[in-house]
């Protein structure tokens, strides 16, 4: 997998080098086609890339939103189950600021989505802040909660080391 800088408004796009045509998959919410055990995005022609969540987290945490990602197969390497390896590799290179304002979504009113015993709620806030609580039936994981605020570049120390669980 190789990451290349892209011009403003390019977005985040995966290019499947193992496919000869219809091999570009844009990383946007409407292209998410599966979220069971990992996140998969697909284009209109059925080309897909899975296990994108750790790389996408690293890119978001490092404020990278215009990048071309060349990949030789249908899955992003899972590495150690966190995004820290991606962050460290990106930190070893240089990034460039683009001469254009970033497009940022601003939550203006409360939005809540519920599905069975699960829910998510977005609330207006001047900073990026996450509160979550999760309660698994397993005694191994059970109930957990966390409060995070992403400020002053703390993504690497406060989020990137978070591991997945099975």
Show where each model-derived region lies.
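Short acidic-hydrophobic catalytic motif
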Residues: 1-164
């Amino acid at each position: 997998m190789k990451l290349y800088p892209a011009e403003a408004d390019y977005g985040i796009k995966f290019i499947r080098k193992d496919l000869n045509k219809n091999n570009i998959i844009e990383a946007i919410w409407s292209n998410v086609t599966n979220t069971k055990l990992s996140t998969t995005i697909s284009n209109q022609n059925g080309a897909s890339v899975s296990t994108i969540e750790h790389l996408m987290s690293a890119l978001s945490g490092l404020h990278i939103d215009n990048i071309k990602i060349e990949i030789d197969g249908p899955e992003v390497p899972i590495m150690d189950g966190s995004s820290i390896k991606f962050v460290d590799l990106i930190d070893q290179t240089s990034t460039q600021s683009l001469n254009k304002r970033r497009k940022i979504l601003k939550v203006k009113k409360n939005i809540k989505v519920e599905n069975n015993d699960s829910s998510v709620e977005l609330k207006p806030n001047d900073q990026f802040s996450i509160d979550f609580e999760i309660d698994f039936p397993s005694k191994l994981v059970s109930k957990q909660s966390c409060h995070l605020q992403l400020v002053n570049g703390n993504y690497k120390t406060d989020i990137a080391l978070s591991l997945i669980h099975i």
